[in-house]
Amino acid sequence: MQWLEAGIVFETEDLFAQTAAELVCNIFYDLGLSGVVTEDPVPVSDHGVRGRVIGYLPVDEALEQTRADLEQMASGLSARHPVRCTLEFTPCDDQDWANAWKDHFFVQKIGRNIVVRPTWRDHVPEPGEVVIDLDPGMAFGTGTHPTTAMCLEMVEKHLAPGTAFLDVGTGSGILMIAAQKLGAKTVWGVDNDGVAVKIAAENLERNGIFAGGNACRIMRADLVTGVDRAFDLVTANILSEVIVALADDVGRVVVPGGLLVCSGIIEPKQAMVEAKLTACGFDIIERKTTDLWVCLVARRTP
């Protein structure tokens, strides 16, 4: 299949950079893409930065409409926010896409002992390392984003061996794999994207973990709809507004005294998320910030 590489180059003030990147990513997500490649913003003036987000569009009968929608949404973003967007389009085939995409990801050490290894990279494990082998396909990253890295750190810090773990919006399955390798007895994941469910299952198998039965399960569902049990540790690396929507029902799947780890939150929306979680019976016990991204650890009140 032929693909069209669509890049949105954005320029904004440095304090708005992460928010701008999230807004640009959302354009691609709203068009139905399951994942994008994000390039870190670089300074272009005393207070200005330039970044780029890349998505890959299939060359099919819907391409012209998708391209027009992309241009319209980028223009609308520039009109509503202090962001100037420029679009770039480059044709490529499957092989070009695979090479370009893989060049963005490397072996990464996260937390104390977690190592995320893209399957196309070599790595000799050191004693004590927890190595996660990932091949996320076209749809997902490999833990390099600050929100994923912070979630991994919190799972490593707070997961007790033998406990039950649930990941909401599991994506590549990276948090499920980490939890199982860190000693969780039960590992479940849920995602509303069928591509995510497939890729997560493949990544689990790549790490010697097989979904099926109560010990390890991946479900396609909207948030925690269909989850019929409670867990000791629940993660949700999703957008701020989705966490707020999740909060009304998430207490049902967290045991009393259990923990909820939320990431994907930008600093301007932190107070909104914390207020909602508190109103829904959670105490915020830990906060971590990287760049403008926030990760919260909340305990369900007994």
Swiss-Prot record:
Its EC number is 2.1.1.-. It comes from the Bacteria. HAMAP family: Methyltr_PrmA. S-adenosyl-L-methionine binds at residues 148, 169, 191, 237. Its main location: cytoplasm. Pfam families: PrmA. This is Ribosomal protein L11 methyltransferase. It catalyses: L-lysyl-[protein] + 3 S-adenosyl-L-methionine = N(6),N(6),N(6)-trimethyl-L-lysyl-[protein] + 3 S-adenosyl-L-homocysteine + 3 H(+). The gene is prmA. It comes from Desulfosudis oleivorans (strain DSM 6200 / JCM 39069 / Hxd3) (Desulfococcus oleovorans). SUPFAM superfamilies: S-adenosyl-L-methionine-dependent methyltransferases (SSF53335). GO terms for cellular component: cytoplasm. It is found in: Cytoplasm. GO terms for biological process: methylation. Methylates ribosomal protein L11. One of its GO terms (molecular function) is protein-lysine N-methyltransferase activity. Keywords: Cytoplasm, Methyltransferase, S-adenosyl-L-methionine, Transferase. InterPro entries: Ribosomal_L11_MeTrfase_PrmA (IPR050078), Ribosomal_PrmA_MeTrfase (IPR004498), SAM-dependent_MTases_sf (IPR029063). Disulfide bonds: none annotated. Belongs to the methyltransferase superfamily. PrmA family.
